[in-house]
Design a protein with these regions (language model features):
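Sec-dependent bacterial lipoprotein signal peptides
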Residues: 1-19
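N-terminal capping/linker segments that flank leucine-rich repeat
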Residues: 2, 21-94, 249-277
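Conserved hydrophobic beta-strand positions in leucine-rich repeat
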Residues: 47, 71-75, 95-97, 114-118, ...
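Conserved hydrophobic position(s) of the canonical leucine-rich repeat
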Residues: 70, 92, 102, 113, ...
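Consensus "Asn ladder" position of solenoid repeat domains
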Residues: 78, 100, 121, 140-143, ...
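Canonical leucine-rich repeat
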Residues: 83-86, 105, 126-129, 148, ...
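Right-handed parallel beta-helix
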Residues: 86, 94-145, 152
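Ankyrin-repeat and related helical/solenoid repeat scaffolds used for protein-protein interactions
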Residues: 198-254
């Protein structure tokens, strides 16, 4: 009797071991899947169409592993109002989402981005740009920003024309080569720490004075239709094209003796002179 009891215990123990091992094997074969929430149906629809969302269904989620494979997103004019979920695209390098309906976006987790193009949205706020250490191209034109701070070590090209900008702070942009800021409401600009700047375009603003003495690499300056009372380009030896016409309170543009500027566009009431009093 004792022997039967003993064998019964052994058999039960063996069965429990087999069941436990079976569960472990099942877990190995069927790992827990992580999903990313994508609440915007138009965003997910495009992910499905581009073969990024592997389940092929618009169901407000994609696999995190799908998101992590993506290095480039092209989302031009897709009716997208939210890019919630983009934080899981941790290997994203290039984001093109022009002509949508975005109001805000947080790119704090997309630290590998080198190109961001969000032209023609409804943006008033963007977060996380200072974390994108590879960022060289930033286009935010045709949006609704009223203030903006550029704080990124590597940005070379910055486009922010056709906004409602009243305040623009260039806090940290040592590698900036080109800035386009046409048609805003900016009254002051300071690019004194952007020593590599070659192209500066800010026509149709409200700027009265600007100190460009540090920006000796400048080649192109377009600043028509501002409110300048003085304009000194005498310390900029590399200028190719300067357009400073339609500044009604600016009569004299200061240049250096012998300074040659191939294209200098002035209004008929303006002159370029070595002395402006």
């Amino acid at each position: 009797m004792k022997k039967l009891h003993y064998f019964a215990i052994i058999i039960i123990a063996m069965l429990l071991t087999i069941v436990a091992c079976s569960k472990i094997d099942d877990e190995d074969l069927n790992p827990v899947l992580e999903f990313v929430v994508i609440p915007d149906a138009n965003f997910e629809k495009e992910l499905v169409l581009q073969g990024i969302d592997s389940d092929g269904i618009v169901n407000q989620k994609i696999l995190k592993s799908d998101a992590e494979k993506v290095e480039k997103l092209s989302l031009y004019s897709k009716g997208i109002s939210s890019l919630t979920g983009i934080e899981s695209f941790s290997n994203l390098k290039r984001l093109y989402a022009d002509a949508n309906s975005l109001k805000t976006i947080d790119l704090s987790s997309n630290v590998l981005l080198d190109t961001i193009s969000l032209t023609s949205n409804n943006l008033t706020k963007i977060e996380g740009l200072e974390r994108a250490k590879n960022l060289t191209w930033l286009s935010l034109s045709w949006n609704y920003f009223t203030e903006f701070t550029l704080d990124n070590d590597n940005v070379k090209n910055f486009l922010m024309d056709h906004n409602d900008l009243v305040s623009l702070e260039i806090k940290n942009a040592p590698k900036l080569e080109s800035a386009t800021l046409n048609i805003n409401k900016i009254s002051s600009l300071d690019f004194s720490n952007s020593l590599l700047l070659k192209t500066l375009i800010f026509s149709a603003n409200r700027v009265k004075t600007i100190d460009l003495s540090n920006n000796v690499n400048l080649e192109y300056i377009y600043c028509s239709s501002n409110l300048f009372t003085e304009f000194d380009i005498s310390k900029l030896p590399n200028l190719i094209d300067v357009r400073v016409d339609r500044n009604p309170t600016l009569n004299c543009i200061k240049i250096a003796p012998g300074q040659q500027i191939p294209t200098l566009k002035l209004s008929d009431y303006q002159t370029a002179n070595i002395n402006c009093n």
